[in-house]
């Protein structure tokens, strides 16, 4: 029985282990930069609303979903890829991140949006290198 499960898991493991840069985005959680920037304009991240909903509502929901996506990347990478400036509270400035992404060359926007957002956060909010400790006497 165990070997049967192992054989069933092999295709899944192969798919998960493949090079993510070589495969196209698989769904709304795996966007490229173009898709992330276009989502607030075209309503593409509001598929769960259905086609009967007004386009204005789809655009509004898609815009909020794109912002939540960026804030999710920020929450998951804070302290490892970027650091909150001293005294700052609240989330990073989403509009500033969007501006950073828009400023990228068009070819960079073919890359995974999650990587682009994390890189924009790291550039805008870099972590300060740790100060070397003085030896105690």
Task: Label each region the model flagged.
Residues 1-8:
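Bacterial N-terminal signal peptides that target proteins for export
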Residues 15-20:
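N-terminal signal peptide c-region/cleavage motif recognized by signal peptidases
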Residues 24-96:
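Short N-proximal segments of mature Sec-exported proteins
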Residues 70-78, 102-106, 121-126:
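Sec-exported extracytoplasmic/periplasmic mature domains
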Residues 85-89, 104-109:
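Short coil/turn segments at secondary-structure boundaries
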Residues 94-104:
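Short helix/strand-capping connector loops at secondary-structure junctions
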Residues 107-137:
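C-terminal partner/receptor-binding element of secreted or periplasmic proteins
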């Amino acid at each position: 029985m165990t070997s049967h499960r192992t054989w069933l898991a092999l295709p899944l493991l192969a798919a998960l282990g493949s090079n993510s840069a070589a495969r196209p985005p698989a769904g709304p959680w795996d966007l490229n930069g173009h898709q992330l920037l276009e989502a607030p304009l075209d309503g593409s991240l509001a598929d769960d609303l259905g086609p009967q909903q007004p386009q204005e509502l789809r655009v509004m929901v898609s815009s909020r979903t794109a912002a939540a996506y960026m804030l999710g990347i920020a929450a998951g990478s804070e302290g490892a890829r970027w650091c909150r400036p001293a005294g700052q509270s609240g989330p990073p400035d989403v509009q500033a991140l969007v501006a950073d992404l828009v400023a990228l060359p068009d070819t960079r926007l073919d890359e995974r949006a999650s990587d682009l957002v994390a890189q924009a956060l790291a550039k805008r909010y870099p972590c300060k290198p740790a100060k070397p400790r003085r030896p105690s006497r």
